[in-house]
Amino acid sequence: MVPVSNEWKAQHDELLLPETFIELSYEITDPQLAVDANTSATNEESFSEAENITDATEKNPERYGTLEQNEWGLDGTFNYFDETPEDAGYTTSVLSGADAKYTAAPTITISFAELQTALIPGLTITWGEGIGEWAVSFRATVYNGTTKIAQMSVADNESVVSKMSMDLQNFNKIVIEIFEWCLPHRRCRVTEVFLGIRETYTKAELLGYTHSESADLLSATLPKSEITFGLDNSTGRWNPNNPSGVEKYLLERQKFVVKYGMNVNGMVEKIKGGTFWLSEWNTPANGIEASFTARDAVTFMNDVYTGPRSGTLKAIATAAFKQANLPVMSDGSARYIVDDSLADITTDFTEDTTAYTIVDVLQMVAHMGCCVFYQDRGGMVRIEPHNEEITDYVINRFRSYTHPEITISKPLRAVSVSYGENLTETLPVEAQGEVQTVSNEFINTAADAKRVANRTADVLKGRKTISGEFRADPRLSALDVISVESKYADNKVAITEITYTTSGGAFKGTYSGRIVG
């Protein structure tokens, strides 16, 4: 569950909610560009990190005091300088003159080993974000070998973030020259050069929005997290036949980052909504709405697994994640976590010739290891034991639109787990009822089969599932354990599926889950 303030929680107990917000950030780029880019620069200071400004990771530059003019304030907003300031980016050793111009233009060169054929709509340059300064005059030139294919000059910039809109395709080098800074006697600073354009959509631009999550307590089915939304196409901006439109830039796996917010005591409190990658879109030439679907990182895991077929579950899962080559997190770290408990469990499926996909392998690892498999709101893909601790979230009758529906399955007589060469481990549960059969090619031993049988029985023997509609708080995620008030009882519920929808007002939600206590 996403942490929020006590004031946020209190607002959801009020009859009328304050204004809520959606912020959907979209990166219009080819995701491979950041991986392939090799960046260098002239006149670098000793602590400069020009090589990192195109890696597409999140930057948090600090403000540190230097001997540049008026850059050692005593107002408490400056950090002491050290040899390696955080996210220094490109920082020059030369200073602008009294007229704020540079005698020799600081120059950034972004080169690629191969010709880049994907079409992108331009560049986004973030200048000295930590100190709130920018270049006034600069130029970007794009090359294919020695041939100049595009150039754009700016002479009057007044913003820390500069968007340079121009079609870029079939290039292998970009050169950015900075001629004038916003202040005299200052170093040139560049926090990031994003190879593409970033756009942000709010509730005002969204014609409809749905966020759905599902995950299985036994990892018997694949997790799923996705958003679907519509954007206004009445002007033809997304029309595929519009030569100046943006449909031509759409590529699978372009990243969307969602944040939700609410007005709390006059300030907007924001929480993580998730990280998704573009999977499908429909931009009809005659339609007034363009629709989009973006999904979680499972979309990267459909290749056939080629890693080791014996060893610990942790080693096999790690190999699968590495093969998937998931985009790194915003801080540059790997986008997956495999619980250490899986280092104590082994398997061997070398004799099995089935061509499993990466996601198949990860699901079977999670299932055999009695773990859940899901992507969290921060975009991290996790395989770990389910956290069964109950949270403070309550779907009470005040928040429910209808009484929750409870479904009771047939009694569980036994769990039968197959393993090895046609062997079976059977765990008795009740005197009568149905037998739940379990099959996982990774399960090789009776001990492993018994562990899986016990976990299966623990989850299924409660028999009750619950579902309903409610005035949703978007901090709630699949696999959270919450309280649900029904007409005659309070239920401890592990959420297995949740959906949020809005057409501009407060979120309306549906949920389903298993009663676990």
Where on the chain are the PLM-derived regions?
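Assembly/oligomerization scaffold segments
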Residues: 1-308, 367-368, 462-470
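Generic solvent-exposed, charged/amphipathic alpha-helical segments
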Residues: 257, 314-325, 363-366, 480-481
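Residue-level recognition of short, structured coil/turn motifs
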Residues: 266, 325-329, 370, 487
